Amino acid sequence: MNNPTISQTVNASCSGTDTAVGHASINKKAIAAAVAGNALEFYDFVIYAYFAVYIGKAFFPVAGEYGSLMAAVATFGVGFFARPLGGILIGAYADRAGRKPAMILTVALITIGTIGLAMTPSYQSIGVAAPIIVVICRLIQGLALGGEVGPATSLLIEAAPPHRRGFYSSWQIASQGIAVAVGGVLGVTLSLWLSAEQLQSWGWRVPFLLSLVLIPIVIYMRRELPETHEAAQERTSTEIVGVVLRDHKKVLVLGILLFASIGVASQIGNYMVSYAVQVLKLSAPIAQGSVLVGGVVTFVFALLGGLLSDRLGRRITNFIPRVILTLAIVPLFMWLVNAPDLVTLFTVNTVIAALTAMFATAGLVQIPELLPIAVRSTGLSLVYALGTAIFGGTTQFIVTWLIAVTNSPMAPAWYLAAISVVSLLAMLFLPESKNIDVRK
């Protein structure tokens, strides 16, 4: 028996039929399934960033203080550059076959990548095969994440009542906060319980292995989802991508520039663990603890940003936090560099996480609202994947390189400020989308 689509349920509820109760129930289920899968995938992705110092030494025995770390974060960036391909393939698949099968596929791919990372022996054990396997695993994870955001966000927006789309889609960013927070808890716990030698030997693998336990649950939840977009198998993926590139160039280009600062700010937040240990010389538990705080803050302020975007509109919720971050990031880093301790690190991470969560939420609902339902998943996947690949994917490598070359710990702040200005300019050319009918 086929499940009704959520859009059908929305129509029924608007016409006053008895399915209104089912609509509310389905929406909660859709949020839970999207959040669980998205959190799992981002958890696996950001865990790599958290433990980059240890992973670098395990798989990339490069000489120099920053050598192995730069090799590790470069491999982290490889996953970002696989995102556009994942966005094209899986995003178009979601517009052709439906949101639900695409969301199940992304979980399967992230599982393969995670198993590979968790089980690969070190360079010392199997030589050059080790970094090659790690790079392949990062590519697979990048494909999955590139194709995850478009279908899942499209489903949430299409499932939501018109006046709640911002709040529903905000759970995508909030779920990333959950992933960061859980990763932070594990990082702090492992740092406290294990010695540096144990962390280097096997401890960093534990968080990857733990995530595998949840995968059957997430797949089951997504299998039970109703569909929000009817399959259109007569269209090929090439045709769908062609429509996006031909008819929606403005949204695509401006969206990529809008997401540039989201990618950079998020990755600088993730990079703070390596930055705190390697540059500020703070202890690993303090560094991991700051990430935990950042994850909790992201969860709270993403939901707040969604509520505000529903009340005030997408543009103003996008604009104000961006301006504040652009103006505040350099003074905040000056404070952190001059007084590197728990309070300053936690404060800087909190400000970055809060402001980024708010404008990321507004952007994540605005872009898909500006795209028609027939190509929404593909368009959003391309915007998100290209924006995060070009800018977010290079962030950790660039700032690590800038710090090493300039000998200035202020490099992350100046880089983020510059990218934020570009995103602000792009945002000014995007129209308000709050009142658009997303079922067309």
Regions found by a protein language model. Name each.
Residues 167-191, 383-395:
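Glycine-rich segments within core transmembrane alpha-helices of 12-TM secondary carriers
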Residues 373-405:
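A late C-terminal transmembrane helix in Major Facilitator Superfamily
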Residues 316-362:
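C-terminal transmembrane helical hairpin of 12-TM major facilitator-type secondary transporters
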Residues 49, 249-297, 392-396:
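Extracytoplasmic gate region of multi-pass secondary transporters
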